[in-house]
């Protein structure tokens, strides 16, 4: 294999060296074989949405009629009888069972499944939680429901209406239901000019405008615009400004899906399973988010340290390189909470290992001990596949994770019962089967043994869509070649830079361009147009052709094959379930297993997991990062709607690779991005092997911008932690879209270049190169906004697009009046910060009122025994802090700043004692309050009058 060249970058007197890490230090790389490229090429598919000759199911299907309707205590049941079989994409089911259930005043379930469930996959509750009935069946009265179910019998169709207004929220009437073994389709009407959000995960703006086609199939691919990527969230939110209401529709299915958003309709398709629809009535956006997320699983409460700054890259290939990065952060006084490793630390890229030469255990542990002694943390990457050792190589064959797993029968199989062997980073690999009886026990042991050698603080799960670099069980009969190299060049060797680089770095750009031209060759890579044949491409009994189903979705891989960069749909689990039916939840069930394994290591310590693939309910176990983005401005912009979409999906702890993962960044982009990313819940810088270094100390400008933003972030840690807790108990996201905050203003529906953090902070980033200003809207009639840095009240017109000064190194940040923000003096780590004095930032609204909350606990316990809750209320020139809970905070209150005070007060009282104050530009500053709060800032209730 050709090694990538070294990249030398001089940064502030330092020389950083980034190497392409060898696959293993213990084997000669030149002797290593490669997975044959032809094994990575799938059978070319033509997606139906691009096939002009494809049959339109709506035009052909005859639908069903409804018979034998019976009322129940909670709704009704009935039988759907097929009017005429058309067998468009599979065979039609003749009889279906219909069940309608009013589950609560705000939730309705419509469930349709074949009467004969032979060979039909019904998603078990053990894999994906089912919303529960609320109330006593004997006393429940569905006439009190916010929702009403109505139906037509002869040509079956149904409507869900809002009971208070009779507004139709969902209607299939006039469109035939299609329900076959490999194709389910229904259509609903939408109002013209609709505002549809959700249906993640994809790189797209916040709104799903007419013409959007969402492919819901978990996919290992580097963040394409509009294509299917890592996660699947089958829920949409319909915000209607004519009635000022919002509702949500959730299809509880793990099937392969496709959603087509039209001008006045939405078509939803699935390639297996049953219809299990849940309607949430809202009526406000936050209401409906809370209703949905509460049912799929409230988000995990993250440890306090998770809110610190995280640094990573693919290319930290020795213990010494990690040590150097940590030392450089300290040298330049840039706060660093957590250092991460990509696959470099592994021995031959194998899970549960560390390279004996580059990451020897004794040296590695010494580094981690030093890190922990400084209250810092370490998180390694962990891939989904387990290496199959070469039985002809005694050294290679000594790999317990495979042998124990194989003996315990915990790996996925081919339909014939043999091991399904794909290919990932270490070579030919097998894949844990989380439906097998012994997998959790095996998983617990592997993680515990690994932790005893390498005491990590969290886990970063990757490649868990689940991904494979070849099509089908390509390692069957080939694992004797292990270790083998992936069928592509590893890392990045290009010379592309972000938009605007040629102008802002003209001399450097000239030399790069000349060097690229000098080394450019006319060599081209041939590409095969032939299709490969999957030897296991057989018809699954009773299910049809599941590797190549009759309806082809637009899977965003070059050949659209479902098995490209994935394991084949016919890979089989211990209970007979095939991947075709549950591919989309592999990440969810793997991350849940890791969560349980980490609890085995530390029974009452919050597991910290950042995962790539996700599904409805994943937020209960993990946070999420946005995957392999690109170092360019358009990707920086898309990080905002991606974050907002994840919030809607119940995963509020989200961030992206700041400065970009793929390609080379530059000083300007990295400065802007490091400041924007500092307001995301998860804050990490990460990039690809072979690209230039992009740690914030590489450029002085980036370093200064980063220090400024980390200082702001760390001062706001109590506020962020309070928002984490709010999200944990209610499901309300931390980052908030304009249309959630101001649901009655349709002109704000598509705003996703700005966002709120909680209710209090408005972030307006610069998202383009070469400018020293940005534009932003400040919504809300009579709303008051203050500049976060100067504390000055701003003179903005509600809804107007304002121009804001934003020189490089500055990101506009405003406080919305009516909020009280708890703060704390920032330290180098979150642990240091927690030892420092508190402050309060009070931003009065136009009526002179404000409110806020503070939540604190020990920052790590799963079962919190002692917590502190503080409610802040300001009104009529008086602030009152009401304290609840037993958690003891010894740090004093040092300062309080009150914004929006029209005239200087004659005196200020703290618990009726006069305190000194300063007054400037409408702000009252109180300092030296420690003497009043020696027992702790929130040891008791206090008041401030002015």
Curated annotation (Swiss-Prot):
InterPro entries noted in UniProt: Gal_mutarotase_sf_dom, Glyco_hydro_31_AS, Glyco_hydro_31_C, Glyco_hydro_31_CS, Glyco_hydro_31_TIM, Glyco_hydro_b, Glycoside_hydrolase_SF
Presence of the UniProt keyword Repeat in the record: no
Chain intervals with Low complexity compositional bias: 517-532
Top-level class of the enzyme under EC nomenclature: hydrolase
One MF annotation (Gene Ontology) recorded for this entry: hydrolase activity, hydrolyzing O-glycosyl compounds
Active site residues per record: 462, 465, 628 (proton donor)
Enzyme Commission number, as recorded: 3.2.1.3
Subcellular location: Secreted, Cell wall; Membrane
Post-translational modification: The N-terminus is blocked.
Region: Disordered, residue numbers: 517-541
One GO process term, biological-process aspect: cell wall organization
Signal peptide positions on this chain: 1-20
Similarity remark: Belongs to the glycosyl hydrolase 31 family.
Name assigned to this protein: Glucoamylase 1
Biological classification of the source: Eukaryota, Fungi, Dikarya, Ascomycota, Saccharomycotina
């Amino acid at each position: 294999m050709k090694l990538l060249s070294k990249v030398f970058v001089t940064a502030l007197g330092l020389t950083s060296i980034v190497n392409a890490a060898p696959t293993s230090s213990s084997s000669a790389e030149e002797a290593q074989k490669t997975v044959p490229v032809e094994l990575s090429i799938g059978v070319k598919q033509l997606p139906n949405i691009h096939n002009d000759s494809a049959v339109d199911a709506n035009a052909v299907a005859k639908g069903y009629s409804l018979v034998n309707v019976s009322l129940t205590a909670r709704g009704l049941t009935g039988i759907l009888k097929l009017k005429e079989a058309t067998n468009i994409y599979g065979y039609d089911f003749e009889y279906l069972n219909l069940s309608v259930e009013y589950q609560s005043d705000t939730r309705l379930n419509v469930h349709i499944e074949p009467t004969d469930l032979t060979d039909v996959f019904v998603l078990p509750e053990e894999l994906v939680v089912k919303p529960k009935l609320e109330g006593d069946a004997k006393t429940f009265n569905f006439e009190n429901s916010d929702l009403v179910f109505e139906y037509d019998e002869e040509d079956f169709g149904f409507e869900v209406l809002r009971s208070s207004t009779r507004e139709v929220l969902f209607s299939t009437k006039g469109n035939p239901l299609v329900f076959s073994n490999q194709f389910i389709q229904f259509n609903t009407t939408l109002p013209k000019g609709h505002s549809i959000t959700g249906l993640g995960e994809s790189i797209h703006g916040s709104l799903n405008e007419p013409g959007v086609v969402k492919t819901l199939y978990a996919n290992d691919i580097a963040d394409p615009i509009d294509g299917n990527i890592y996660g699947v969230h089958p829920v949409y939110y319909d915000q209607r400004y004519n009635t000022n209401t919002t509702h949500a529709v959730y299809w509880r299915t793990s099937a392969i899906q496709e959603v087509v958003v039209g001008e006045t309709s939405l078509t939803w398709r699935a390639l297996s399973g049953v219809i299990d629809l849940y309607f949430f009535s809202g009526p406000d956006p936050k209401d409906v988010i809370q209703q949905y997320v509460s049912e799929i699983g409230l988000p995990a409460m993250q440890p306090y340290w998770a809110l610190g700054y995280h640094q990573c890259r693919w290319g930290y290939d020795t213990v010494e390189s990690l040590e150097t990065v940590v030392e450089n952060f300290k040298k330049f006084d840039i706060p660093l909470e957590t250092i991460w490793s990509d696959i470099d630390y592994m021995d031959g890229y194998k899970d549960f290992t560390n390279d004996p030469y580059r990451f020897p255990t004794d040296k590695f542990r010494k580094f981690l001990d030093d890190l922990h002694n400084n209250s810092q943390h370490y998180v390694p990457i962990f891939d989904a596949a387990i290496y199959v050792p070469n039985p002809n190589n005694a050294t290679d064959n000594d790999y317990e994770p495979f042998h124990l797993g194989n003996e315990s029968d915990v790996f996925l199989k081919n339909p014939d019962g043999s091991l399904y062997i794909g290919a990932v980073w270490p070579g030919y690999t097998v894949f844990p089967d989380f439906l097998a009886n012994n997998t959790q026990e095996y998983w617990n042991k592997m993680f515990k043994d690994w932790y005893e050698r390498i005491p990590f603080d969290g886990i970063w799960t990757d490649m868990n869509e689940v991904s494979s670099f070849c099509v089908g069980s390509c390692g069957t009969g080939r694992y004797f070649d292990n270790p083998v190299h992936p069928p592509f060049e590893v890392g990045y060797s290009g010379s592309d830079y972000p938009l605007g680089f040629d102008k802002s770095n003209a001399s450097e750009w000239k030399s790069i361009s000349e060097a690229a031209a000098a080394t450019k060759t006319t060599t081209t890579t041939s590409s095969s147009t032939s299709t490969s044949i999957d030897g296991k491409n057989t018809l699954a009994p009773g299910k049809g052709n599941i590797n190549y189903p009759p309806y082809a979705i637009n899977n965003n891989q070059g050949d659209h094959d479902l098995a490209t960069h994935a394991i084949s749909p016919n890979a089989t689990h211990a209970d007979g379930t095939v991947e075709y039916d549950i591919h989309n939840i592999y990440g969810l069930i793997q991350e849940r297993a890791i969560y349980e394994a980490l609890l085995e290591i530390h029974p009452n310590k919050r597991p910290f997991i950042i995962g790539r693939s996700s599904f409805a309910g994943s937020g209960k176990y993990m946070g999420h990062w946005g995957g392999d983005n690109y170092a360019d401005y358009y990707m920086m912009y898309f990080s905002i709607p991606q974050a907002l979409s994840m919030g809607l999906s119940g995963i509020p702890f989200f961030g992206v690779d700041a400065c970009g993962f793929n390609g080379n960044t530059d000083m300007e982009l990295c400065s802007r991005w490091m400041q924007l990313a500092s307001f995301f819940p998860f804050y990490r810088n990460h990039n690809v092997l072979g690209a230039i270094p992009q740690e914030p100390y590489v450029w002085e400008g980036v370093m200064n911008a980063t220090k400024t933003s980390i200082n702001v972030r760390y001062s706001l840690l109590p506020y962020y932690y309070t928002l984490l807790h709010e999200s944990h108990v209610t499901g309300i996201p931390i980052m908030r879209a304009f249309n959630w905050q101001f649901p009655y203003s349709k002109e704000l529906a598509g705003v996703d270049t700005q966002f709120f953090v909680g209710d209090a902070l408005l972030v307006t980033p610069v998202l383009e190169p070469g400018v020293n200003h940005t534009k932003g809207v400040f919504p809300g009639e009579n709303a008051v906004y203050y500049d976060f840095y100067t504390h000055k009240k701003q003179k903005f017109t509600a809804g107007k697009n304002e121009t804001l000064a934003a020189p490089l190194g500055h990101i506009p940040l405003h406080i919305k009046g009516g909020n009280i923000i708890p703060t704390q003096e920032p330290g180098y780590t979150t642990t240091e910060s927690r030892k420092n004095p508190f402050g309060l930032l009070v931003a009065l609204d136009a009526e002179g009122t404000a409110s806020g909350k503070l939540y604190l606990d020990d920052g790590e316990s799963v079962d919190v025994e002692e917590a502190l809750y503080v409610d802040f209320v300001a009104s009529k020139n008086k602030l009152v802090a009401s304290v609840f809970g037993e958690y003891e905070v010894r740090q004093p209150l040092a300062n309080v700043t009150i914004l929006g005070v029209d005239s200087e007060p004659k005196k200020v009282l703290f618990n009726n004692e006069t305190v000194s104050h300063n007054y400037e530009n409408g702000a009252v500053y109180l300092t030296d309050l420690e003497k009043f709060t020696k027992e702790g800032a929130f040891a008791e209730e206090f008041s401030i009058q002015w």
